[in-house]
Amino acid sequence: MDDVGRLWTGIGVCAAVILLMAFLTLCENAAVEFNDAKLKKMAEEDKDPKAIKLAALLKRTGRVVATNLIARSIMIIVVSVGGVIFFYEPISDGLYTLFNYQAPYYVSGICSFVIISCLLALVICTFGIGIPKKLCISGKVGEKFILNNCGVYKVFLAVFSPLAAVSGAVSAGILRLFGIKSTNKADSVTEQ
């Protein structure tokens, strides 16, 4: 594959994964910020099937957030690996030529790796996390979005839930080594 084709393929793969990450971020924020009283009314009184699905999903908010975190972490790894696979050689060769072959080849390799890492971090933070969160906070994306996409969101959560379960089990085991019970106090609300 030539360098131009490799670059376009890399851009396409990374963009697709970042869009999926943005979708998960939008869904998580919209679901967590959904008005509980309104959702309960829609599910129980209005018998809205979308609201019933969402209410069932949000019964375990901690698990949804943990699964979403695992999914986004895996997507960040996929984008990083894809960035190295698709962008490293063309950028490294271009930098080596730019340095007029004066520096050793590994210098251009290190520089290309740093460039790829910084650019991907910027793109992931901006388009995969920052903009979707701000869209939810501003109210542009909210209740209607999560109600319409709850089924698709549940599928993505189901795909990543085995990894979240393994991560939870490992975390619980490590916490037990330190004498800490793995009960989630964030889910229980106490009045003080």
Regions found by a protein language model. Give the residues of each.
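Membrane-embedded alpha-helical segments of inner-membrane proteins
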Residues: 1-191
